[in-house]
Amino acid sequence: MRRPRGEPGPRAPRPTEGATCAGPGESWSPSPNSMLRVLLSAQTSPARLSGLLLIPPVQPCCLGPSKWGDRPVGGGPSAGPVQGLQRLLEQAKSPGELLRWLGQNPSKVRAHHYSVALRRLGQLLGSRPRPPPVEQVTLQDLSQLIIRNCPSFDIHTIHVCLHLAVLLGFPSDGPLVCALEQERRLRLPPKPPPPLQPLLRGGQGLEAALSCPRFLRYPRQHLISSLAEARPEELTPHVMVLLAQHLARHRLREPQLLEAIAHFLVVQETQLSSKVVQKLVLPFGRLNYLPLEQQFMPCLERILAREAGVAPLATVNILMSLCQLRCLPFRALHFVFSPGFINYISGTPHALIVRRYLSLLDTAVELELPGYRGPRLPRRQQVPIFPQPLITDRARCKYSHKDIVAEGLRQLLGEEKYRQDLTVPPGYCTDFLLCASSSGAVLPVRTQDPFLPYPPRSCPQGQAASSATTRDPAQRVVLVLRERWHFCRDGRVLLGSRALRERHLGLMGYQLLPLPFEELESQRGLPQLKSYLRQKLQALGLRWGPEGG
Protein backbone atom coordinates (compact mmCIF):
# COMPACT_ATOMS: atom_id res chain seq x y z
CA MET A 1 0.00 0.00 0.00
CA ARG A 2 1.52 3.33 -1.06
CA ARG A 3 1.46 6.51 0.93
CA PRO A 4 -0.22 9.51 -0.80
CA ARG A 5 2.12 11.95 -2.40
CA GLY A 6 3.06 15.04 -0.51
CA GLU A 7 2.73 13.36 2.85
CA PRO A 8 5.78 13.21 5.11
CA GLY A 9 7.50 9.93 5.74
CA PRO A 10 6.86 7.69 8.70
CA ARG A 11 7.59 9.15 12.08
CA ALA A 12 6.88 8.15 15.64
CA PRO A 13 3.54 9.37 16.93
CA ARG A 14 3.57 12.13 19.50
CA PRO A 15 2.75 11.39 23.12
CA THR A 16 -0.86 10.53 23.65
CA GLU A 17 -2.87 13.68 24.29
CA GLY A 18 -6.61 14.19 24.42
CA ALA A 19 -8.67 16.49 22.27
CA THR A 20 -12.22 17.40 21.63
CA CYS A 21 -14.35 18.22 18.68
CA ALA A 22 -17.98 18.80 17.99
CA GLY A 23 -20.27 16.15 16.70
CA PRO A 24 -21.78 15.99 13.25
CA GLY A 25 -23.85 18.98 12.36
CA GLU A 26 -21.92 21.36 14.60
CA SER A 27 -19.07 23.74 13.85
CA TRP A 28 -15.85 22.71 15.44
CA SER A 29 -13.62 25.21 17.21
CA PRO A 30 -11.33 24.87 20.23
CA SER A 31 -13.50 27.07 22.41
CA PRO A 32 -12.78 27.43 26.15
CA ASN A 33 -15.78 25.23 26.90
CA SER A 34 -14.62 22.40 24.70
CA MET A 35 -13.02 19.16 25.83
CA LEU A 36 -9.89 20.21 23.96
CA ARG A 37 -8.97 22.75 26.60
CA VAL A 38 -9.38 20.13 29.31
CA LEU A 39 -7.17 17.70 27.47
CA LEU A 40 -4.53 20.31 26.59
CA SER A 41 -4.46 21.53 30.18
CA ALA A 42 -3.59 18.00 31.22
CA GLN A 43 -0.25 18.18 29.39
CA THR A 44 1.42 19.26 32.60
CA SER A 45 -0.06 16.25 34.38
CA PRO A 46 0.91 13.05 32.57
CA ALA A 47 -1.10 10.97 35.02
CA ARG A 48 -4.27 12.89 34.29
CA LEU A 49 -3.69 12.85 30.54
CA SER A 50 -3.01 9.13 30.43
CA GLY A 51 -6.08 8.53 32.51
CA LEU A 52 -8.32 10.44 30.12
CA LEU A 53 -7.27 8.46 27.07
CA LEU A 54 -6.52 5.16 28.73
CA ILE A 55 -8.20 2.42 26.68
CA PRO A 56 -7.81 -1.33 26.63
CA PRO A 57 -5.14 -2.53 24.23
CA VAL A 58 -6.17 -3.87 20.83
CA GLN A 59 -6.25 -7.64 20.77
CA PRO A 60 -3.14 -9.04 19.05
CA CYS A 61 -5.23 -11.51 17.08
CA CYS A 62 -6.75 -8.56 15.22
CA LEU A 63 -3.46 -7.08 14.16
CA GLY A 64 -2.00 -9.80 11.97
CA PRO A 65 1.73 -10.50 11.72
CA SER A 66 4.25 -7.89 12.79
CA LYS A 67 6.72 -6.17 10.49
CA TRP A 68 9.34 -8.70 11.57
CA GLY A 69 7.48 -11.45 9.79
CA ASP A 70 5.84 -13.15 12.78
CA ARG A 71 2.74 -14.87 11.59
CA PRO A 72 -0.23 -15.35 13.93
CA VAL A 73 -1.77 -18.74 14.38
CA GLY A 74 -4.30 -19.24 11.60
CA GLY A 75 -3.36 -15.91 9.94
CA GLY A 76 -4.23 -15.55 6.26
CA PRO A 77 -2.50 -13.69 3.45
CA SER A 78 -4.44 -10.51 4.26
CA ALA A 79 -2.85 -10.20 7.72
CA GLY A 80 0.04 -8.08 6.40
CA PRO A 81 -2.10 -5.38 4.70
CA VAL A 82 -4.33 -5.21 7.77
CA GLN A 83 -1.34 -4.54 9.99
CA GLY A 84 0.04 -2.09 7.47
CA LEU A 85 -3.20 -0.10 7.44
CA GLN A 86 -3.08 0.14 11.22
CA ARG A 87 0.44 1.60 11.06
CA LEU A 88 -0.68 4.12 8.44
CA LEU A 89 -3.57 5.21 10.62
CA GLU A 90 -1.30 5.53 13.66
CA GLN A 91 1.08 7.76 11.64
CA ALA A 92 -1.52 9.93 9.86
CA LYS A 93 -0.78 13.67 10.01
CA SER A 94 -4.29 15.06 9.58
CA PRO A 95 -7.92 14.08 10.03
CA GLY A 96 -8.32 14.17 6.28
CA GLU A 97 -5.60 11.56 5.87
CA LEU A 98 -7.34 9.33 8.43
CA LEU A 99 -10.54 9.56 6.43
CA ARG A 100 -8.75 8.78 3.16
CA TRP A 101 -7.07 5.68 4.55
CA LEU A 102 -10.40 4.37 5.85
CA GLY A 103 -12.37 5.25 2.74
CA GLN A 104 -9.91 4.15 0.05
CA ASN A 105 -9.27 0.67 1.47
CA PRO A 106 -12.68 -0.80 2.42
CA SER A 107 -11.52 -4.38 1.84
CA LYS A 108 -8.63 -3.98 4.28
CA VAL A 109 -10.48 -2.11 7.02
CA ARG A 110 -11.24 -4.12 10.15
CA ALA A 111 -13.38 -3.14 13.12
CA HIS A 112 -10.46 -2.20 15.36
CA HIS A 113 -9.15 0.26 12.75
CA TYR A 114 -11.94 2.70 13.65
CA SER A 115 -10.85 2.82 17.29
CA VAL A 116 -7.26 3.38 16.11
CA ALA A 117 -8.48 6.26 13.91
CA LEU A 118 -10.38 7.88 16.79
CA ARG A 119 -7.39 7.58 19.05
CA ARG A 120 -5.12 9.14 16.42
CA LEU A 121 -7.67 11.93 15.91
CA GLY A 122 -7.42 12.78 19.59
CA GLN A 123 -3.64 12.86 19.34
CA LEU A 124 -3.76 15.16 16.33
CA LEU A 125 -6.23 17.58 17.87
CA GLY A 126 -4.19 17.75 21.04
CA SER A 127 -0.84 18.25 19.32
CA ARG A 128 1.28 21.36 19.89
CA PRO A 129 2.10 24.06 19.08
CA ARG A 130 -0.98 24.14 16.85
CA PRO A 131 -3.40 21.38 15.95
CA PRO A 132 -4.12 20.84 12.27
CA PRO A 133 -7.27 22.42 10.87
CA VAL A 134 -10.34 20.23 10.81
CA GLU A 135 -13.15 20.62 8.31
CA GLN A 136 -16.66 19.98 9.50
CA VAL A 137 -17.39 17.73 6.54
CA THR A 138 -14.41 15.56 7.49
CA LEU A 139 -15.81 14.91 10.97
CA GLN A 140 -19.24 14.18 9.54
CA ASP A 141 -17.84 11.73 7.02
CA LEU A 142 -15.77 9.99 9.69
CA SER A 143 -18.81 9.75 11.96
CA GLN A 144 -20.97 8.36 9.17
CA LEU A 145 -18.28 5.85 8.29
CA ILE A 146 -18.17 4.56 11.88
CA ILE A 147 -21.97 4.57 12.16
CA ARG A 148 -22.31 2.58 8.94
CA ASN A 149 -19.81 -0.09 10.02
CA CYS A 150 -20.41 -0.31 13.79
CA PRO A 151 -22.89 -3.22 13.44
CA SER A 152 -19.88 -5.39 12.55
CA PHE A 153 -17.87 -4.28 15.62
CA ASP A 154 -17.25 -6.63 18.51
CA ILE A 155 -18.09 -5.51 22.04
CA HIS A 156 -14.47 -4.58 22.79
CA THR A 157 -14.22 -2.25 19.78
CA ILE A 158 -17.60 -0.69 20.57
CA HIS A 159 -16.48 0.10 24.12
CA VAL A 160 -13.22 1.65 22.91
CA CYS A 161 -14.89 3.75 20.20
CA LEU A 162 -17.60 4.91 22.59
CA HIS A 163 -15.01 5.84 25.18
CA LEU A 164 -12.93 7.82 22.69
CA ALA A 165 -15.94 9.53 21.11
CA VAL A 166 -17.01 10.85 24.50
CA LEU A 167 -13.49 12.03 25.30
CA LEU A 168 -13.21 13.76 21.93
CA GLY A 169 -16.30 15.79 22.70
CA PHE A 170 -18.88 14.25 20.41
CA PRO A 171 -22.25 15.13 21.98
CA SER A 172 -23.94 12.38 23.94
CA ASP A 173 -27.16 12.85 21.97
CA GLY A 174 -25.36 12.99 18.60
CA PRO A 175 -25.67 10.28 15.96
CA LEU A 176 -22.22 8.75 16.58
CA VAL A 177 -22.57 8.24 20.33
CA CYS A 178 -26.19 7.14 19.99
CA ALA A 179 -25.31 4.56 17.33
CA LEU A 180 -22.43 3.16 19.38
CA GLU A 181 -24.55 3.10 22.54
CA GLN A 182 -27.32 1.26 20.71
CA GLU A 183 -24.88 -1.35 19.46
CA ARG A 184 -23.45 -1.71 22.95
CA ARG A 185 -26.90 -2.48 24.34
CA LEU A 186 -27.51 -5.02 21.59
CA ARG A 187 -24.30 -6.83 22.56
CA LEU A 188 -25.31 -7.13 26.21
CA PRO A 189 -26.56 -10.57 27.29
CA PRO A 190 -30.31 -10.68 27.61
CA LYS A 191 -31.40 -9.67 31.07
CA PRO A 192 -33.66 -12.24 32.69
CA PRO A 193 -37.14 -10.90 33.21
CA PRO A 194 -37.86 -9.86 36.79
CA PRO A 195 -39.67 -12.56 38.71
CA LEU A 196 -43.36 -12.07 38.70
CA GLN A 197 -44.55 -11.07 42.12
CA PRO A 198 -48.29 -11.42 42.07
CA LEU A 199 -50.24 -10.17 45.01
CA LEU A 200 -50.30 -13.31 47.08
CA ARG A 201 -52.49 -13.25 50.12
CA GLY A 202 -52.90 -15.49 53.08
CA GLY A 203 -51.44 -18.95 52.87
CA GLN A 204 -50.02 -18.43 49.38
CA GLY A 205 -48.15 -15.30 50.48
CA LEU A 206 -46.86 -17.07 53.57
CA GLU A 207 -45.63 -20.03 51.54
CA ALA A 208 -43.98 -17.75 48.97
CA ALA A 209 -42.16 -15.83 51.68
CA LEU A 210 -40.98 -18.96 53.48
CA SER A 211 -39.91 -20.67 50.25
CA CYS A 212 -37.57 -17.80 49.35
CA PRO A 213 -33.89 -18.79 49.79
CA ARG A 214 -33.21 -15.55 51.66
CA PHE A 215 -35.56 -16.02 54.59
CA LEU A 216 -34.57 -12.87 56.48
CA ARG A 217 -35.78 -10.69 53.61
CA TYR A 218 -39.24 -11.04 55.07
CA PRO A 219 -39.67 -9.51 58.55
CA ARG A 220 -41.83 -10.99 61.23
CA GLN A 221 -44.64 -8.51 60.55
CA HIS A 222 -44.94 -9.85 56.99
CA LEU A 223 -45.23 -13.42 58.26
CA ILE A 224 -47.72 -12.45 60.95
CA SER A 225 -49.93 -10.51 58.53
CA SER A 226 -49.83 -13.31 55.95
CA LEU A 227 -50.75 -15.81 58.65
CA ALA A 228 -53.63 -13.64 59.85
CA GLU A 229 -55.01 -13.29 56.31
CA ALA A 230 -54.82 -17.00 55.55
CA ARG A 231 -57.96 -19.06 55.46
CA PRO A 232 -57.94 -22.31 57.45
CA GLU A 233 -57.83 -24.46 54.32
CA GLU A 234 -54.74 -22.56 53.09
CA LEU A 235 -52.66 -23.47 56.14
CA THR A 236 -51.44 -26.85 54.96
CA PRO A 237 -48.90 -29.01 56.83
CA HIS A 238 -46.30 -28.02 54.24
CA VAL A 239 -46.79 -24.31 54.95
CA MET A 240 -46.70 -24.78 58.72
CA VAL A 241 -43.56 -26.93 58.51
CA LEU A 242 -41.89 -24.16 56.49
CA LEU A 243 -42.90 -21.67 59.16
CA ALA A 244 -41.57 -23.88 61.97
CA GLN A 245 -38.27 -24.42 60.18
CA HIS A 246 -37.97 -20.69 59.54
CA LEU A 247 -38.44 -19.83 63.21
CA ALA A 248 -36.03 -22.51 64.39
CA ARG A 249 -33.35 -21.72 61.82
CA HIS A 250 -33.29 -18.00 62.54
CA ARG A 251 -33.93 -18.24 66.30
CA LEU A 252 -37.10 -16.15 66.01
CA ARG A 253 -39.01 -16.51 69.28
CA GLU A 254 -42.23 -14.96 68.01
CA PRO A 255 -45.09 -15.98 70.36
CA GLN A 256 -47.88 -15.24 67.88
CA LEU A 257 -46.39 -17.50 65.21
CA LEU A 258 -45.49 -20.24 67.68
CA GLU A 259 -48.99 -20.23 69.12
CA ALA A 260 -50.37 -20.55 65.59
CA ILE A 261 -48.24 -23.65 65.03
CA ALA A 262 -49.39 -25.15 68.34
CA HIS A 263 -53.04 -24.49 67.50
CA PHE A 264 -52.60 -26.02 64.04
CA LEU A 265 -51.05 -29.13 65.58
CA VAL A 266 -53.98 -29.55 67.97
CA VAL A 267 -56.61 -29.01 65.27
CA GLN A 268 -54.95 -31.31 62.73
CA GLU A 269 -53.91 -33.98 65.24
CA THR A 270 -55.51 -36.91 63.48
CA GLN A 271 -54.16 -35.88 60.07
CA LEU A 272 -50.49 -35.52 61.04
CA SER A 273 -47.86 -38.24 61.11
CA SER A 274 -45.02 -38.26 63.61
CA LYS A 275 -42.56 -37.30 60.85
CA VAL A 276 -44.48 -34.05 60.33
CA VAL A 277 -45.03 -33.51 64.06
CA GLN A 278 -41.29 -33.70 64.79
CA LYS A 279 -40.77 -30.72 62.46
CA LEU A 280 -43.65 -28.77 63.96
CA VAL A 281 -42.44 -29.14 67.56
CA LEU A 282 -38.80 -28.40 66.71
CA PRO A 283 -39.00 -24.61 67.27
CA PHE A 284 -40.63 -25.01 70.67
CA GLY A 285 -37.70 -26.94 72.10
CA ARG A 286 -35.03 -24.96 70.28
CA LEU A 287 -36.50 -21.59 71.27
CA ASN A 288 -37.33 -22.73 74.81
CA TYR A 289 -40.99 -21.79 74.41
CA LEU A 290 -43.86 -23.68 76.02
CA PRO A 291 -47.09 -22.65 74.23
CA LEU A 292 -50.17 -21.46 76.06
CA GLU A 293 -52.37 -23.87 74.10
CA GLN A 294 -53.93 -26.09 76.78
CA GLN A 295 -54.22 -29.16 74.56
CA PHE A 296 -50.64 -28.98 73.26
CA MET A 297 -49.12 -31.58 75.59
CA PRO A 298 -52.12 -33.96 75.67
CA CYS A 299 -52.17 -33.85 71.87
CA LEU A 300 -48.47 -34.75 71.64
CA GLU A 301 -48.92 -37.60 74.12
CA ARG A 302 -51.70 -39.06 72.00
CA ILE A 303 -49.62 -38.73 68.83
CA LEU A 304 -46.65 -40.43 70.51
CA ALA A 305 -48.84 -43.26 71.73
CA ARG A 306 -50.24 -43.74 68.24
CA GLU A 307 -47.06 -43.29 66.16
CA ALA A 308 -44.23 -44.39 68.46
CA GLY A 309 -43.65 -47.72 66.75
CA VAL A 310 -43.98 -46.36 63.21
CA ALA A 311 -41.06 -43.90 63.05
CA PRO A 312 -38.50 -44.45 65.85
CA LEU A 313 -36.28 -41.50 64.93
CA ALA A 314 -39.24 -39.12 64.72
CA THR A 315 -40.45 -40.34 68.10
CA VAL A 316 -37.09 -39.65 69.73
CA ASN A 317 -36.87 -36.24 68.04
CA ILE A 318 -40.24 -35.26 69.51
CA LEU A 319 -39.09 -36.38 72.96
CA MET A 320 -35.89 -34.35 72.58
CA SER A 321 -37.91 -31.20 71.98
CA LEU A 322 -40.10 -31.98 74.99
CA CYS A 323 -37.00 -32.69 77.09
CA GLN A 324 -35.78 -29.15 76.47
CA LEU A 325 -39.18 -27.93 77.69
CA ARG A 326 -39.05 -30.23 80.77
CA CYS A 327 -42.30 -31.91 79.68
CA LEU A 328 -41.41 -35.58 79.23
CA PRO A 329 -44.45 -37.91 79.17
CA PHE A 330 -43.87 -41.07 81.21
CA ARG A 331 -45.79 -43.32 78.82
CA ALA A 332 -43.54 -42.39 75.89
CA LEU A 333 -40.44 -42.90 78.04
CA HIS A 334 -41.65 -46.39 78.94
CA PHE A 335 -41.85 -47.18 75.24
CA VAL A 336 -38.47 -45.80 74.08
CA PHE A 337 -36.62 -47.40 77.00
CA SER A 338 -38.25 -50.79 76.45
CA PRO A 339 -35.93 -53.63 75.34
CA GLY A 340 -37.95 -54.17 72.17
CA PHE A 341 -37.52 -50.57 71.01
CA ILE A 342 -33.80 -50.51 71.86
CA ASN A 343 -33.19 -53.78 70.01
CA TYR A 344 -35.15 -52.50 67.03
CA ILE A 345 -33.21 -49.26 66.65
CA SER A 346 -29.86 -51.04 67.07
CA GLY A 347 -30.14 -52.43 63.55
CA THR A 348 -31.16 -49.17 61.86
CA PRO A 349 -28.82 -46.74 60.02
CA HIS A 350 -29.50 -44.00 62.58
CA ALA A 351 -28.74 -46.21 65.59
CA LEU A 352 -25.90 -44.01 66.92
CA ILE A 353 -27.85 -40.76 66.89
CA VAL A 354 -30.87 -42.44 68.50
CA ARG A 355 -28.66 -43.92 71.24
CA ARG A 356 -27.17 -40.48 71.85
CA TYR A 357 -30.63 -38.97 72.21
CA LEU A 358 -31.72 -41.82 74.46
CA SER A 359 -28.64 -41.22 76.62
CA LEU A 360 -29.66 -37.59 77.02
CA LEU A 361 -33.22 -38.61 77.85
CA ASP A 362 -31.87 -41.04 80.45
CA THR A 363 -29.83 -38.21 81.99
CA ALA A 364 -32.92 -36.00 82.09
CA VAL A 365 -34.85 -38.78 83.83
CA GLU A 366 -32.01 -39.20 86.34
CA LEU A 367 -31.77 -35.52 87.19
CA GLU A 368 -35.26 -34.12 86.63
CA LEU A 369 -37.80 -36.92 87.08
CA PRO A 370 -37.45 -38.42 90.57
CA GLY A 371 -40.90 -39.98 90.35
CA TYR A 372 -40.17 -42.06 87.26
CA ARG A 373 -40.17 -45.80 88.00
CA GLY A 374 -40.14 -47.27 84.51
CA PRO A 375 -37.38 -48.88 82.43
CA ARG A 376 -34.13 -47.03 81.80
CA LEU A 377 -31.42 -47.15 79.17
CA PRO A 378 -28.93 -49.94 80.00
CA ARG A 379 -25.41 -48.79 80.84
CA ARG A 380 -23.90 -50.71 77.94
CA GLN A 381 -26.14 -48.79 75.52
CA GLN A 382 -25.22 -45.34 76.83
CA VAL A 383 -22.91 -43.11 74.79
CA PRO A 384 -21.51 -39.60 75.44
CA ILE A 385 -24.19 -37.02 74.77
CA PHE A 386 -22.15 -34.09 73.44
CA PRO A 387 -18.50 -35.26 73.42
CA GLN A 388 -17.30 -32.09 71.65
CA PRO A 389 -18.39 -28.47 71.19
CA LEU A 390 -21.63 -28.09 69.31
CA ILE A 391 -21.64 -27.55 65.55
CA THR A 392 -22.71 -23.91 65.86
CA ASP A 393 -19.74 -23.18 68.13
CA ARG A 394 -17.30 -24.87 65.75
CA ALA A 395 -18.77 -22.99 62.79
CA ARG A 396 -18.47 -19.64 64.57
CA CYS A 397 -15.17 -20.26 66.33
CA LYS A 398 -13.54 -17.20 64.75
CA TYR A 399 -16.26 -14.99 66.28
CA SER A 400 -16.06 -16.63 69.71
CA HIS A 401 -14.46 -15.12 72.81
CA LYS A 402 -13.08 -18.50 73.87
CA ASP A 403 -9.50 -17.89 72.75
CA ILE A 404 -9.10 -14.55 74.48
CA VAL A 405 -10.76 -15.85 77.66
CA ALA A 406 -8.36 -18.80 77.62
CA GLU A 407 -5.40 -16.43 77.32
CA GLY A 408 -6.76 -14.30 80.15
CA LEU A 409 -7.11 -17.35 82.42
CA ARG A 410 -3.63 -18.52 81.48
CA GLN A 411 -2.08 -15.22 82.51
CA LEU A 412 -4.31 -14.85 85.55
CA LEU A 413 -4.26 -18.36 87.02
CA GLY A 414 -1.65 -20.34 85.12
CA GLU A 415 -2.03 -23.20 82.68
CA GLU A 416 -2.28 -25.84 85.42
CA LYS A 417 -5.34 -24.40 87.10
CA TYR A 418 -8.00 -24.69 84.43
CA ARG A 419 -9.09 -27.08 81.70
CA GLN A 420 -10.61 -26.06 78.39
CA ASP A 421 -13.21 -28.03 76.38
CA LEU A 422 -13.31 -30.83 78.93
CA THR A 423 -16.15 -33.34 78.55
CA VAL A 424 -17.62 -34.36 81.90
CA PRO A 425 -19.93 -37.33 82.54
CA PRO A 426 -22.43 -38.12 81.16
CA GLY A 427 -21.06 -36.28 78.14
CA TYR A 428 -21.39 -32.51 78.43
CA CYS A 429 -18.56 -30.42 76.99
CA THR A 430 -17.56 -27.55 79.29
CA ASP A 431 -15.94 -24.32 78.14
CA PHE A 432 -13.58 -23.87 81.11
CA LEU A 433 -13.41 -25.90 84.31
CA LEU A 434 -11.68 -24.94 87.57
CA CYS A 435 -11.21 -26.90 90.79
CA ALA A 436 -11.29 -25.08 94.11
CA SER A 437 -10.88 -26.18 97.72
CA SER A 438 -13.52 -25.67 100.38
CA SER A 439 -11.75 -22.46 101.39
CA GLY A 440 -11.90 -21.11 97.81
CA ALA A 441 -8.29 -21.65 96.76
CA VAL A 442 -7.97 -22.54 93.08
CA LEU A 443 -6.23 -25.92 92.82
CA PRO A 444 -4.19 -27.37 89.96
CA VAL A 445 -6.53 -29.52 87.91
CA ARG A 446 -3.97 -32.31 87.57
CA THR A 447 -3.99 -32.88 91.36
CA GLN A 448 -7.77 -33.28 91.47
CA ASP A 449 -10.31 -35.40 89.70
CA PRO A 450 -12.02 -32.78 87.53
CA PHE A 451 -15.19 -34.85 87.24
CA LEU A 452 -17.94 -34.91 89.78
CA PRO A 453 -19.33 -38.42 90.21
CA TYR A 454 -22.40 -38.94 88.15
CA PRO A 455 -25.27 -39.37 90.69
CA PRO A 456 -26.36 -42.99 91.18
CA ARG A 457 -29.86 -43.85 90.10
CA SER A 458 -30.89 -44.63 93.64
CA CYS A 459 -30.29 -41.03 94.74
CA PRO A 460 -33.46 -38.95 94.65
CA GLN A 461 -33.45 -35.55 93.07
CA GLY A 462 -31.92 -32.85 95.23
CA GLN A 463 -29.57 -35.26 97.02
CA ALA A 464 -27.25 -35.97 94.11
CA ALA A 465 -25.37 -32.71 94.30
CA SER A 466 -25.23 -32.67 98.09
CA SER A 467 -23.93 -36.25 98.31
CA ALA A 468 -21.25 -35.43 95.76
CA THR A 469 -20.11 -32.40 97.71
CA THR A 470 -20.01 -34.28 101.01
CA ARG A 471 -17.81 -37.02 99.58
CA ASP A 472 -15.55 -34.57 97.78
CA PRO A 473 -14.93 -31.21 99.51
CA ALA A 474 -13.46 -29.69 96.33
CA GLN A 475 -15.88 -27.69 94.22
CA ARG A 476 -15.90 -27.56 90.43
CA VAL A 477 -16.51 -24.21 88.76
CA VAL A 478 -17.56 -24.14 85.11
CA LEU A 479 -17.08 -20.88 83.22
CA VAL A 480 -19.91 -20.81 80.67
CA LEU A 481 -19.48 -18.62 77.60
CA ARG A 482 -22.80 -17.17 76.54
CA GLU A 483 -22.17 -16.04 72.99
CA ARG A 484 -24.61 -14.01 70.94
CA TRP A 485 -25.78 -17.06 68.96
CA HIS A 486 -26.59 -18.95 72.18
CA PHE A 487 -29.72 -16.81 72.60
CA CYS A 488 -32.93 -16.37 70.68
CA ARG A 489 -32.73 -13.47 68.28
CA ASP A 490 -33.57 -10.07 69.80
CA GLY A 491 -34.06 -11.54 73.24
CA ARG A 492 -32.43 -12.74 76.43
CA VAL A 493 -33.78 -16.30 76.37
CA LEU A 494 -31.19 -19.06 76.03
CA LEU A 495 -31.75 -21.62 73.31
CA GLY A 496 -33.19 -24.88 74.51
CA SER A 497 -30.00 -26.94 74.12
CA ARG A 498 -27.94 -24.34 76.04
CA ALA A 499 -30.47 -24.07 78.83
CA LEU A 500 -30.63 -27.87 79.07
CA ARG A 501 -26.84 -28.19 79.39
CA GLU A 502 -26.56 -25.51 82.06
CA ARG A 503 -29.52 -26.96 83.95
CA HIS A 504 -28.04 -30.46 84.00
CA LEU A 505 -24.54 -29.27 84.96
CA GLY A 506 -26.05 -27.37 87.87
CA LEU A 507 -28.06 -30.41 88.99
CA MET A 508 -24.90 -32.55 88.91
CA GLY A 509 -23.17 -30.19 91.36
CA TYR A 510 -21.07 -27.94 89.13
CA GLN A 511 -21.00 -24.27 90.05
CA LEU A 512 -21.71 -22.20 86.94
CA LEU A 513 -20.13 -18.82 86.22
CA PRO A 514 -21.82 -17.30 83.14
CA LEU A 515 -19.81 -14.91 80.95
CA PRO A 516 -22.36 -13.00 78.82
CA PHE A 517 -21.28 -11.77 75.41
CA GLU A 518 -22.27 -8.15 76.22
CA GLU A 519 -19.76 -8.04 79.06
CA LEU A 520 -17.04 -9.75 77.02
CA GLU A 521 -17.54 -7.40 74.07
CA SER A 522 -17.18 -4.37 76.34
CA GLN A 523 -13.66 -5.38 77.41
CA ARG A 524 -11.01 -3.50 75.44
CA GLY A 525 -7.89 -5.57 75.27
CA LEU A 526 -6.39 -8.31 77.40
CA PRO A 527 -5.65 -6.17 80.50
CA GLN A 528 -9.31 -5.19 80.84
CA LEU A 529 -10.38 -8.79 80.27
CA LYS A 530 -8.05 -10.03 83.01
CA SER A 531 -9.48 -7.46 85.40
CA TYR A 532 -12.99 -8.57 84.45
CA LEU A 533 -12.19 -12.26 85.04
CA ARG A 534 -10.52 -11.42 88.35
CA GLN A 535 -13.66 -9.67 89.56
CA LYS A 536 -15.86 -12.56 88.43
CA LEU A 537 -13.77 -15.21 90.17
CA GLN A 538 -13.36 -13.18 93.35
CA ALA A 539 -17.13 -12.67 93.50
CA LEU A 540 -17.41 -16.47 93.88
CA GLY A 541 -14.95 -16.39 96.76
CA LEU A 542 -12.09 -17.89 94.76
CA ARG A 543 -8.50 -16.92 95.44
CA TRP A 544 -5.12 -17.87 93.97
CA GLY A 545 -1.46 -17.21 94.60
CA PRO A 546 0.54 -14.33 93.15
CA GLU A 547 2.43 -16.69 90.85
CA GLY A 548 -0.70 -17.11 88.76
CA GLY A 549 -1.51 -13.43 88.30
From Swiss-Prot:
- Keyword Methyltransferase in the entry? The reply is no
Give the UniProt tissue specificity note. Answer: Expressed in heart, brain, placenta, lung, liver, skeletal muscle, kidney and pancreas.
Q: Where's the RAP domain?
A: 477-535
Q: Where is the signal peptide?
A: none
Molecular functions (GO terms): ATP binding; Fas-activated serine/threonine kinase activity; protein serine kinase activity; protein serine/threonine kinase activity; RNA binding
Using the UniProt record, name the top-level EC class of this enzyme in a single word: transferase
Q: What is the effect of changing V424L?
A: In a lung adenocarcinoma sample; somatic mutation
Spell out the residue ranges making up region: Disordered.
1-30
**Any one annotated GO CC term:** mitochondrial matrix
Keywords for the protein's UniProt record, in alphabetical order: Apoptosis, ATP-binding, Kinase, Mitochondrion, Nucleotide-binding, Phosphoprotein, RNA-binding, Serine/threonine-protein kinase, Transferase
Among the record's GO biological process terms, what is one?
apoptotic signaling pathway
Q: Which PROSITE patterns match?
A: RAP
* Annotated EC: 2.7.11.1, 2.7.11.8
Subunit-structure text: Interacts with TIA1; the interactions leads to TIA1 phosphorylation. Interacts with TIAR.
Q: What does this protein do?
A: Phosphorylates the splicing regulator TIA1, thereby promoting the inclusion of FAS exon 6, which leads to an mRNA encoding a pro-apoptotic form of the receptor.
Record text about domains: The RAP domain is essential for RNA-binding.
Q: Which family does it belong to?
A: Belongs to the FAST protein kinase family.
Name it: Fas-activated serine/threonine kinase
| Gene transcribed to yield this protein | FASTK
